[in-house]
């Protein structure tokens, strides 16, 4: 009987130790002291891999509209976000908001190449002031969506340039008063 109690106690101790050590894992970033821990923690993109039905749905999405809409929709084909002379507002960033997680969750090289076709012009558009994106866009809203995209890209790629663009942009926001309403 003592052996069973000892074994049970040992197993429980291992489980508890394993669970608490997980909270210190990079995939489970908690709030630093003295902040209260959140009940739910957002996991970094890619820390959970889709399988089964979910993977099938994502593969259908990759073979469908998300994986191909930028091949034929003029607003995306010629988007200023990817270096063209077309649409410069929010369509490109919203498209990327779906494409980036899809490409990296599926580990799909074709989609990752598409992501790079968009991300490289965005990263290289960052100015010394911190503003980035198409030159003809003067509205802050599309950059809010683009910041989310850059953060997703940073999480899956580790590309520090994406994080630097976001940091520079937030410095710009701190130093530049709001320009609402848009006068143009």
Residue ranges and their predicted role:
Residues 10-14:
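Hydrophobic helical h-region of N-terminal Sec-dependent signal peptides
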Residues 17-18:
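C-terminal motif of bacterial Sec signal peptides marking the signal peptidase cleavage site
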Residues 21-184:
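Glycan-recognition and catalytic cores of secretory/periplasmic carbohydrate-active enzymes
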């Amino acid at each position: 009987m003592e052996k069973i109690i000892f074994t049970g106690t040992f197993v429980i101790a291992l489980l508890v130790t394993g669970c608490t050590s997980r909270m210190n894992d990079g995939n489970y970033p908690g709030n630093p002291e003295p902040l209260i821990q959140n009940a739910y923690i957002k996991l970094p993109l890619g820390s959970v891999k889709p399988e089964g039905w979910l993977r099938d749905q994502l593969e259908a999405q990759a073979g469908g509209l998300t994986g191909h809409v930028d091949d034929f929709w003029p607003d995306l084909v010629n988007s200023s976000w990817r270096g063209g002379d077309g649409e410069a507002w929010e369509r490109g960033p919203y498209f990327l908001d779906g494409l980036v997680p899809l490409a990296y969750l599926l580990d799909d090289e074709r989609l990752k190449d598409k992501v790079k076709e968009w991300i490289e012009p965005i990263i290289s558009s960052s100015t010394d002031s911190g503003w980035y994106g198409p030159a003809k866009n003067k509205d802050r809203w599309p950059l809010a969506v683009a910041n989310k995209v850059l953060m997703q890209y940073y999480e899956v790629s580790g590309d520090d340039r994406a994080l630097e663009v976001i940091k520079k942009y937030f410095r710009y926001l701190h130093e530049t008063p709001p320009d609402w309403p848009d006068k143009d």
